[in-house]
């Protein structure tokens, strides 16, 4: 089977960059780099194993089929995505304490 194409939403890109900036300001470059590597690892994993992330149970029918995976080393941060045979679409990369259904 062909590996699906990766698509990052504008919101996911903004989430990742916002968190990099936050870590740079709070803890410096080493933690920001660790975050970038962890997000890259999580994205690579869902592209390779898209069915591995559990389905989310949101009330909204528009969010059916959304899956999640934790960011390694940052377990409170979650990557939300959908997939089909052709692509893995990353919706958001956010802290799990936020109003997730509203954000997605």
Predicted regions and their residues:
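Arg/Lys-rich, positively charged N-terminal/basic patches that mediate binding to nucleic acids
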Residues: 1-42
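Short, charged, intrinsically disordered terminal tails
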Residues: 2-3, 7, 61, 99-104
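Residue-level recognition of specific faces of alpha-helices
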Residues: 15, 42-45, 68, 80
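Short, hydrophobic secondary-structure boundary micro-motifs
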Residues: 32, 54-58, 102
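A short, surface-exposed loop/turn module that caps and links secondary-structure elements
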Residues: 44-72
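Enriched for short, Lys/Arg-rich terminal
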Residues: 71-104
């Amino acid at each position: 089977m062909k590996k699906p194409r990766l698509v990052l939403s504008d919101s996911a890109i903004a989430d990742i960059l916002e968190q990099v900036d936050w870590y740079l300001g709070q803890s410096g470059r080493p933690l920001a780099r660790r975050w970038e590597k962890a997000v890259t690892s999580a994205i690579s994993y869902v592209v390779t194993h898209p069915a591995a992330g559990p389905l989310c149970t949101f009330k909204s029918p528009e969010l059916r089929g959304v899956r999640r995976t934790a960011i390694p080393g940052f377990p409170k941060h979650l990557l939300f995505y959908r997939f089909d045979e052709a692509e893995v679409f990353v919706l958001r990369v956010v802290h799990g304490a936020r109003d997730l259904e509203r954000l997605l």
